């Protein structure tokens, strides 16, 4: 999604020209295009003549004054001229940490000691004989030791949590006005960030977006409203802010900008959605600012806005989605604002929370999905891959994996190192080499990350695509979709260049023509030169244009983004 900014001069010119870096993106503006038109390439601020530097600094002061007036209580300064950070990109393998744990004191000797213990365990050596010292090593030190001694190279740290509390003392006026940082557990964030940078650990700021009971209570006019007056609260008694409300957007993004200024490489939005159980609350609530839009439009537009406003800060953006987002289509029936393609197209990373414990009986064919960490993860990720393959430039899939035991589920299994890493193995076999482990208590088993010998490089048969689908199976699925009017399947199975990119336009065209396959027979599937195949098909189509009889017609089967897709032959209609 993002382009690295070559220097902050670019930001300066862009902000002045667009009257931007504040407010909201104008309709149709692509935040990715904003730098290319104004870039002064191959220049560095430090290498400019002193006079030019002075002029730019003077202009920056004026710009910041203008931005401060425009943004008011949401003002966050731009990165300092000459001190910009490069856009850092890694294949993140991450652990989640609360702000409380991240605020613990840490001792580097203890980190190294625990890292040595991990190394000994990985090599099959007896554990060290100093249990007293091990007992004194805190959760933060253990997490940092895991980063030192395993493939884990990233941490996801709460900066605004599920209660709406900001992790540190903030310079943002609105945060201080409402007091959302009253606890500030991450008091010495500079020390932690400095250490993470010194160890090349990728820093991800978790920002809970719209589940924010603190802001909803402090400024209840910006919460989801009840039709008969008052603020809506979910089944747990928690108030949510209104995702259609641009005032809320500014609040969330200002905290994101501050996290970027303080050294985070990525901003991750969790609860970037509406409350679940929408069927229960839809009839009794209202969303000021909705103006007839669907919920997934609000989430899409928020992420577009966040992209635009965070562009000068040189950070990636990621978005967490429910595991069901890999299975549902157009946010139905959930109606919580999470449509996969709309979020993937506005994020650098899309992070489905595919915890096996969160799937009900029968999902993916398993009575207790929690007992099948490998298979559930594999099937869910195959769905995610198929959805991503239908977009030109979607965010990279980086799944959340279950790092906890779900004791509340009848028939559940202990999620030990083997069960947790089974999920990682499933991802790696599908070519997904990033992940985040969730454990709310921040207790992580280091042996989880020594799984590599269990990866099977031959999970696919020769000729199958990444979904383990043969050319014959792909064309059959396509023809069944044409026969059954399954537009979402047709959208996924048609090459991007052969259809409308926008799904709404795609289905509008299909519904206008009323084209449907009445019957078909696959005569044969033959391999062409290279990686393509041809299916020989006979059958009959009906539409508003008449009838089209196909006799041994050739359907091309082509790989796109590692998935077989179908190019249908031209049809001749008889009125």
Q: Across the structure, where does each feature detected by a protein language model lie?
A:
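Active-site-adjacent "subsite" loops/lids of carbohydrate-active enzymes
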Residues: 83-137, 194, 205, 210-261
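Catalytic domains of carbohydrate-active enzymes, especially glycoside hydrolases
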Residues: 138-164, 261-266, 346-349, 427-434
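Aromatic-lined carbohydrate-binding/catalytic grooves of carbohydrate-active enzymes
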Residues: 150-185, 276-283
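Aromatic-lined carbohydrate-recognition surfaces of secreted/lumenal glycan-active proteins
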Residues: 202-212, 268-269, 295-336, 392-404
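Substrate-binding cleft of secreted/luminal carbohydrate-active enzymes
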Residues: 347-361, 370-459
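Short, low-complexity N-terminal intrinsically disordered segments enriched in polar/charged residues
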Residues: 458-484
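Short solvent-exposed beta->alpha transition segments
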Residues: 472-473, 487-534
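Exposed beta-sheet edge and beta->alpha loop/turn motif
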Residues: 526-575
């Amino acid at each position: 999604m993002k382009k690295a900014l070559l220097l902050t001069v670019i930001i300066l010119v862009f902000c002045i020209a667009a009257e931007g870096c504040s407010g909201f993106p104008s309709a149709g503006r692509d935040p990715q295009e904003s730098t290319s038109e104004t870039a002064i390439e191959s220049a560095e601020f430090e290498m400019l003549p002193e006079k030019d530097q002075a002029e730019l600094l003077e202009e920056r002061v004026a710009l910041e004054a203008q931005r401060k007036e425009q943004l008011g209580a949401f003002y966050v300064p731009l990165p300092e001229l000459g001190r910009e950070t490069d856009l850092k990109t890694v294949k993140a393998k991450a652990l989640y940490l609360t702000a409380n744990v991240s605020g613990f004191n840490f001792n580097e000797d203890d980190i190294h000691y625990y890292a040595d213990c991990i190394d000994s365990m990985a090599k099959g050596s007896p554990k060290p004989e100093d249990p007293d010292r091990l007992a004194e090593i805190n959760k933060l030190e253990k997490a940092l030791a895991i980063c030192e001694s395993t493939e884990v190279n990233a941490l996801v740290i709460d900066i605004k949590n599920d209660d709406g509390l900001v992790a540190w003392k903030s310079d943002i006026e609105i945060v201080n006005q409402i007091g959302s940082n009253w606890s500030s557990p991450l008091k010495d964030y500079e020390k932690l960030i400095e250490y993470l940078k010194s160890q090349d650990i990728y820093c991800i700021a978790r920002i809970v977006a719209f589940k924010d009971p603190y802001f909803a209570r402090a400024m209840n006019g910006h919460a989801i409203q009840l039709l008969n007056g008052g603020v809506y609260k979910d089944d747990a008694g928690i108030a949510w802010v209104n995702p259609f409300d641009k005032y809320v957007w500014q609040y969330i993004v200002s905290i994101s900008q501050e996290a970027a200024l303080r050294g985070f490489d990525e901003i991750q939005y969790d609860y970037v959605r509406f409350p679940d159980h929408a069927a229960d609350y839809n009839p009794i609530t209202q969303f000021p600012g909705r103006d007839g839009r669907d919920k997934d439009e609000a989430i899409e537009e928020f992420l577009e806005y966040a992209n635009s406003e965070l562009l000068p800060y040189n950070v990636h953006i990621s978005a967490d989605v429910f595991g069901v987002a890999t299975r549902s289509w157009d946010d139905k029936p959930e109606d919580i604002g999470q449509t996969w393609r709309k979020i993937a197209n506005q994020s650098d990373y899309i992070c489905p929370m595919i915890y096996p414990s969160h799937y009900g009986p029968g999902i993916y064919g398993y009575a207790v999905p929690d007992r099948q960490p490998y298979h559930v993860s594999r099937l869910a990720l195959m769905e995610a891959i198929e959805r991503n393959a239908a977009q030109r430039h979607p965010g990279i899939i980086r799944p959340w994996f279950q790092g906890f035991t779900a004791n509340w589920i009848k028939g559940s299994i202990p999620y030990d190192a083997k069960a947790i890493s089974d999920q990682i193995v499933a991802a790696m076999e599908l070519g997904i080499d990033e992940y985040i482990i969730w454990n709310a208590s921040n207790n992580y088993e280091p042996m989880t990350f020594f799984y590599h010998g269990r990866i099977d490089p031959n999970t696919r048969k020769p000729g199958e695509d990444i979904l383990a689908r043969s050319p014959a199976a792909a064309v059959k699925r396509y023809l069944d979709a044409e026969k059954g009017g399954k537009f979402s399947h047709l959208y996924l199975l048609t090459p991007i260049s052969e259809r409308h990119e926008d799904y709404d336009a795609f289905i509008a065209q299909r519904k206008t023509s009323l084209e449907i396959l009445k019957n078909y027979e696959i005569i044969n599937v033959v391999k062409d030169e290279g990686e393509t195949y041809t299916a020989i098909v006979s059958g009959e189509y009906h539409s508003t244009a008449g009838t089209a009889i196909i006799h041994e017609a050739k359907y091309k089967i082509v790989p796109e983004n590692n998935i077989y897709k179908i190019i249908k032959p031209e049809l001749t209609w008889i009125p």
